[in-house]
């Protein structure tokens, strides 16, 4: 019960409620009543354990299966209903975003298929009065354990969906399928997903949740090379420019709402996170623009400037960030090599890119070794 109470207030802080106090109160009461029911059920089950066990062992197979199927169906329905209530009682636009993510999550679909198929089979067995041998119960126990494993995966997956950093990551990861969106709620085009990311981070900024903002930006930094719209989409330059403008706007909002908050010494790290993210996005954007011009000298000049300024960038004194940047450089090298092999990139341009990127990678690796030696001393 106490666990449900803590979870309730955590959810209240995460979401921007619709303004109707009644909805918020209804949801809180829903969780409170549910926690009381679960608590009472557990107490009653423990007190009457012997009676329940005797009833199960002395009854027929069909009634056992009906009982187990009913219990599993109840648990599944509760999990789905709780997640549905959490999504529906958030703000309208955030509700669309969460629903879009959730119904496309493989773990959610797997849970629905396995859980409700199991319940259907148990009830079907009970209705047909199938008598099983004792050895067959071993299989049934494994099936029940599989369902409880699915419950755990379901809860973990949903916790990720309502966590801003995972929500942002999931939205950006999805492959762009073109500008055929039927509306904001579909989030099927890159522009809609970029705006959804903006809204999620903006809401965290407005409530002063510095920690969540930093986590979102760090997640974007880490997985940037996995976002289709920025790496492989034909309009990636446009999306990179759009995202850079979004980050700039969010940074202004962050300065206004978070930087001068009392008891927030952590807030300055948010500006550092913005700076690091903008650098990564700007690097990808600039190199794509230079390649499009097919100007080898311009490409060399940009990468050489980055090479010469590695020691001057304060952000590269952060070992973790430098490792992320090296990872991005290696991914870019692989990407351009693949494009060259597919005749999408001139070999001459690729060779220049390869030389400059390898030099930059070596420079960063030297910087990493330098930082490691400083830490050891």
Curated annotation (Swiss-Prot):
Its main location: membrane. It is found in: Cell membrane. Keywords: Cell membrane, Membrane, Transmembrane, Transmembrane helix. This is Uncharacterized protein MJ0704. The chain crosses the membrane at residues 26-46, 67-87, 108-128, 135-155. GO terms for cellular component: plasma membrane. The keyword NAD does not apply. It is a multi-pass membrane protein.
């Amino acid at each position: 019960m106490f666990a449900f109470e803590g979870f309730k207030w955590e959810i209240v802080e995460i979401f921007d409620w619709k303004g109707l106090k009644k909805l918020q109160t209804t949801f809180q009461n829903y969780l409170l009543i549910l926690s009381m029911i679960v608590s009472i059920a557990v107490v009653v089950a423990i007190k009457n354990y012997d009676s329940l066990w005797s009833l199960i062992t002395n009854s027929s197979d069909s009634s056992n299966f009906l009982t187990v199927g009913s219990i599993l169906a109840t648990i599944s329905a509760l999990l789905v209903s709780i997640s549905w209530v959490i999504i529906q009682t958030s703000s309208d636009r955030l509700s669309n975003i969460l629903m879009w993510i959730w119904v496309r999550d493989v773990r959610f679909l797997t849970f629905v298929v396995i859980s409700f198929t199991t319940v259907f089979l148990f009830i079907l067995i009970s209705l047909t009065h199938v008598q099983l041998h004792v050895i067959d119960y071993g299989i049934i126990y494994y099936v029940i354990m599989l369902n409880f494993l699915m419950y755990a995966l379901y809860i973990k997956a949903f916790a990720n969906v309502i966590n801003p950093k995972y929500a942002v990551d999931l939205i950006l990861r999805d492959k762009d399928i073109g500008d055929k969106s039927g509306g904001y709620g579909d989030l099927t085009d890159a522009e809609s997903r970029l705006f959804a990311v903006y809204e999620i981070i903006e809401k965290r900024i407005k409530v002063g949740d510095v920690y969540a903002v930093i986590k979102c930006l760090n997640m974007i930094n880490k997985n940037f090379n996995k976002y289709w719209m920025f790496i492989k989409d034909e309009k990636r330059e446009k999306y990179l420019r759009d995202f850079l403008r979004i980050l700039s706007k969010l940074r202004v909002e962050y300065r206004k709402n978070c930087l001068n908050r009392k008891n927030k010494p952590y807030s300055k790290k948010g500006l550092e996170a913005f700076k690091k993210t903008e650098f990564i996005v700007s690097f990808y954007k600039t190199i794509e623009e230079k390649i499009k011009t097919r100007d080898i000298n311009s490409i060399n000049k940009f990468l050489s400037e980055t090479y010469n300024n590695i020691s001057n960038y304060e952000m590269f004194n952060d070992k973790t960030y430098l490792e992320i940047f090296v990872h991005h450089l290696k991914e870019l090298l692989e990407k351009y090599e693949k494009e060259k092999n597919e005749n999408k990139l001139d070999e001459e341009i690729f060779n220049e890119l390869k030389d400059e990127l390898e030099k930059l990678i070596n420079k960063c690796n030297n910087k990493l070794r330098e930082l490691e030696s400083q830490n050891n001393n």
